[in-house]
A protein has these predicted regions:
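Bacterial N-terminal signal peptides
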Residues: 1-4
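Active-site-adjacent loops and short helices of periplasmic peptidoglycan-processing enzymes
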Residues: 9-172, 177-181
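Compositionally biased non-globular segments, especially hydrophobic aliphatic-rich helices
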Residues: 8-9, 311
């Protein structure tokens, strides 16, 4: 999905805060609509996601809700095991009953580990089965560096394995999660309540949600080995970016790098309207055996591409049209493509269509043409 470009580091050196490789393990900035990666460092290296794993918990649960197998209104009875999970929690007690919607809020907004376990047990009957589904779903998404061993992301206990992933893999997961508005509704909520208002849920990303215009989450993660992680998304005037920071030294650096990346996106890239649906272009296709020798072409759909000003100047639009096409040809028939290239990467491809119908020559047409040509020569 998408491709990688690397702007000059000078683009960041002029900023107030320099990004130092000592302060983080990986970062990534991507355009959410096209999937194009705009800036990155060490995105394929193995890292520990910590609580970012709850993004996969949320995705699987939302997909099961959408399938109709479960509902946000389901009552979830808390097990003994879920009540014993430590770290970030909402202090669930064995035998308590909560709506699945409440536990989803606690997991996404408050990063509650006990709520994540309760959700997993409800959805598939056991945490073990849920983790198996997490790994199979990761494989489907192309998350090749990812191995999940928990639903909460806590440091492993004795004889347990630690969750492993990469910035690139969580970029793939973020793209999939963004297909579900309900997740953003939760992840962009700064403050909510739990247990009938007796417990407050403060978003673990509350500082950026409050201070960064357009911020909508998505998920924080931390433990000592992992460092400070954040998958975030922000939208302004219809333009959405995804930012990923892994292994930051502290939460302050995590926030600053996130601001860097998102600011870089919003300040340096914009969508260019390059072609419009039905737009005629100065190209035609040669037709063999038709009532005319060629047919003009038009663009099948509108084309908008996110580019920097410099990239716009470098963009090449290349037509790919068959040398000859045999009649008959229908009106609005796909006949070739326009390809939009930046350096050695194709950003987009759109079909070209015929402006009108071109019937096949018949005997009457051939005779008529012969007499016409004779009259013209006499």
């Amino acid at each position: 999905i998408g491709f990688i470009t690397t702007p000059s580091i000078l683009a960041f050196s002029k900023r107030e805060i320099a990004i130092s490789k000592k302060n983080y393990k990986a970062f990534l900035l991507a355009d959410a609509e096209s999937g194009r990666i705009l800036y990155q460092d060490r995105i394929y290296e193995n890292n520990y996601p910590a609580s970012l794993v709850k993004m996969m918990v949320a995705l699987i649960t939302i997909e099961e809700i959408n399938s109709g197998r479960i509902s946000l209104n389901d009552n979830v009875i808390i097990s003994s095991w879920a009540s014993k999970i430590g770290g970030h929690q909402v202090y669930l007690k064995q035998g308590e009953k909560f709506k699945l919607s409440e536990l989803m809020k606690a997991t996404i907004i408050g990063s509650a580990n006990d709520a994540a376990v309760a959700i997993a047990e409800h959805v598939y009957g056991s945490v073990k089965v849920f983790i198996k589904k997490m790994n199979s779903r990761a494989k489907e998404l192309g998350m090749l560096k990812t191995s999940f061993y928990s639903v909460h992301g806590l440091p492993p206990g004795k004889n347990q394995k630690i969750d492993v992933s990469s910035a690139y893999d969580f970029y793939l997961l973020a793209l999939e999660v963004l297909k579900h508005p309900k997740f953003l509704q939760w992840s962009s909520t700064r403050l909510d309540s739990f247990r009938k208002g007796t417990f407050q849920l403060l978003n673990t990303n509350h500082r950026l949600i409050k201070s960064y215009h357009g911020m909508q989450g998505m998920k924080t993660g931390y433990h000592r080995k992992a460092g400070f992680n954040l998958v975030s998304t922000a939208i302004r005037k219809g333009q959405r970016f995804i930012s990923i920071v892994l292994g930051a030294k502290n939460s302050r650096i995590r926030q600053k790098i996130t601001r860097f990346l998102l600011d870089y996106g919003f300040e340096n890239f914009k969508k260019y309207d390059l072609n419009y649906i039905g737009e005629s272009i100065s190209l035609s296709a040669k037709i063999e055996g038709g009532t005319v020798g060629s047919v003009p072409l038009k663009v099948a759909k509108s084309v908008r591409i996110l580019l920097s000003d410099i990239e716009r100047k470098k963009l090449r639009i290349l037509p790919k049209i068959p040398i000859k096409t045999k009649a008959p040809i229908k009106a609005n028939q796909n006949l070739g493509n326009l390809e939009y290239w930046l350096n050695d990467k194709m950003l987009k491809k759109v079909h070209l269509q015929t402006e009108f119908e071109v019937p096949k020559q018949n005997i009457l047409f051939v005779i008529t043409e012969m007499f016409t040509n004779l009259n013209e020569t006499n």
